[in-house]
Design a protein with these regions (language model features):
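N-terminal beta1-alpha1 ligand-phosphate binding loop
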Residues: 2-34
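Short beta-strand elements in bilobed, periplasmic/extracellular small-molecule ligand-binding domains
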Residues: 34-43, 47, 140-149
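N-terminal beta-loop-helix "entrance" segment that forms/cooperates
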Residues: 41-58, 154-156
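Glycine-rich phosphate/pyrophosphate-binding loop and the adjoining helix
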Residues: 2, 7, 140-185
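Cofactor-binding loop segments of dinucleotide-utilizing enzymes, especially the Rossmann-like FAD-
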Residues: 11-12, 41, 116
């Protein structure tokens, strides 16, 4: 049976971050036929440097990231917002995925960004930045997925059925864009 693979790029390195918990919820509650894989090791990536992005010399964590994203059908960034923008770890991952020039692992893949953070706008600017960077890297950004959730004055947003329903709806939308992009057999 074939399935749709969605890889998740996490913008937070904290083991118990709300954004990791969102990713785990999507992984655990993904509908039949959809596999959600959380990419681990983004913190191990060196900062992008064209001088080490040379065939045969690419660092192992970078090769693994490119292979995992390249084999996926869709990409979902789940991220907080740091100082009004996306975290450096996510920006760096997108930088590595965008290269080598003309061979981006993100090229043509449906991409969305969402998440939660304890700010008034819930990470909106971070998500906009991630979508813009992914677009430049060649991804097909799914514009109708926009969940930037504020956690201010909310004890556990993952205990809110309405919020989890919105997350699962976003996953379905992302997967449907991937299916539309597949050529007819």
């Amino acid at each position: 049976m074939s399935h749709t693979r969605v890889v998740v790029l996490l913008g937070s390195l904290r083991s118990q971050s709300i954004n990791r918990r969102i990713a785990e919820t999507l992984r655990d509650q993904a509908p039949a036929g959809t596999v959600v894989e959380i990419v681990d090791g983004l913190g191990e990536l060196p900062f992008y440097n064209e001088e080490i992005d040379v065939e045969g010399e690419v660092p192992g964590p970078v090769s693994r990231l490119r292979a995992q994203v390249g084999a996926a059908d869709s990409v979902l960034a789940i991220t907080p917002e740091y100082n009004g923008t996306m975290p450096a770890v996510l920006n760096n991952a997108i930088d590595w995925l965008s290269r080598p020039y003309g061979a981006s692992a993100l090229s043509g893949k449906p991409f969305a960004a969402l998440g939660a953070t304890p700010t008034r706008f819930g990470g909106k600017w971070s998500h906009e930045d991630a979508r813009r960077s992914a677009t430049v890297a060649g991804a097909h950004v799914v514009a109708d997925i926009a969940i930037s959730e504020s956690t201010i004055d909310r004890e556990d947003i993952l205990a809110e059925p309405e919020f989890v329903g919105r997350l699962l709806g976003a996953l379905d939308t992302l997967v449907s864009h991937q299916v539309e992009a597949k050529p007819a057999a």
